[in-house]
UniProtKB/Swiss-Prot annotation:
It catalyses: (E)-4-coumaroyl-CoA + 3 malonyl-CoA + 3 H(+) = 2',4,4',6'-tetrahydroxychalcone + 3 CO2 + 4 CoA. Pfam families: Chal_sti_synt_C, Chal_sti_synt_N. Its EC number is 2.3.1.74. GO terms for molecular function: naringenin-chalcone synthase activity. This is Chalcone synthase. The gene is CHS. Coiled coil: none annotated. It is an enzyme of class 2 (transferase). Keywords: Acyltransferase, Flavonoid biosynthesis, Transferase. The primary product of this enzyme is 4,2',4',6'-tetrahydroxychalcone (also termed naringenin-chalcone or chalcone) which can under specific conditions spontaneously isomerize into naringenin. It comes from Pueraria montana var. lobata (Kudzu vine). GO terms for biological process: flavonoid biosynthetic process; polyketide biosynthetic process.
Amino acid sequence: MVSVAEIRQAQRAEGPATILAIGTANPPNCVDQSTYPDYYFRITNSEHMTELKEKFQRMCDKSMIKKRYMYLTEEILKENPNMCAYMAPSLDARQDMVVVEVPKLGKEAATKAIKEWGQPKSKITHLIFCTTSGVDMPGADYQLTKQLGLRPYVKRYMMYQQGCFAGGTVLRLAKDLAENNKGARVLVVCSEITAVTFRGPSDTHLDSLVGQALFGDGAAAVIVGSDPIPQVEKPLYELVWTAQTIAPDSEGAIDGHLREVGLTFHLLKDVPGIVSKNIDKALFEAFNPLNISDYNSIFWIAHPGGPAILDQVEQKLGLKPEKMKATRDVLSDYGNMSSACVLFILDEMRRKSAENGLKTTGEGLEWGVLFGFGPGLTIETVVLRSVAI
């Protein structure tokens, strides 16, 4: 007779969780950041607010964003004037859009990840779906399971309303699932659409305007599993260690509230300061066991909440400018896509590392860190180990 300990041991994987594939997707509608203020104030019938428009133009100029992708086109917004007002009841219209479009965009990213993985989708055992764009029952996880044709007994986890730190959260959960369920293959999907947050400008709510200058739409998917099958599965990164913490004295720093008017955001001015003040401790906990204290010796994937956060983190840690290159490139080309951002950066980094002839998926380095920052203020930390190219 086998013991309980033997049964437990047999259920667990032998090696660490690895990322086996990455896929990304964006809506076709591309928005140029340099002309966005003109478009935004015109479509929201706010062109008379000249001072506010100038302020918004400065926000967009300082954002370090060149372009973003958005599901919302001019035609859609003209059909839904309440979404263009500052605080008009519009939740039904927003919900009708996102409950369809969030799983649809997620499917596009997931299909690419499954193709790269190269295994039949029947081998997917778990699904994690994450979005801050709309809520429904059954959820986007159910819709995606149906749309992809996954087996009905795939174990699903639906994460709604997590916000910008959740790219780290999904990797933490996927790591635990992969390492504690032998043979598990976890499909992780983050899909975000700004139709829930788009609204007209107001000079009494400038943090809403910050969101209008930064947020973009995108979906990213990864396959996570332990003990990759040799010659069949090709790991890209190992997920070595994870943590989540609430920054002290940060209550109200980033809040989001779902109301009749859609999802509203409230930001304290010192969000970059709170993040940079707490980053040292998070890094020490993560890398002290590895005897790493030189943070220029690791590769960096940080949620690009905005350029000010990246600037202050760089300054606090004395990071070389090239450390945040992949992060800044994704911010520039896509804007802040909330939970999907860090997965886009992982994809960007492994592609550029290969293109530039570097030895590992982590810009030629062995160890790296992935950070998520969001409501709470919550900080997610993931220690990554790159793979030889």
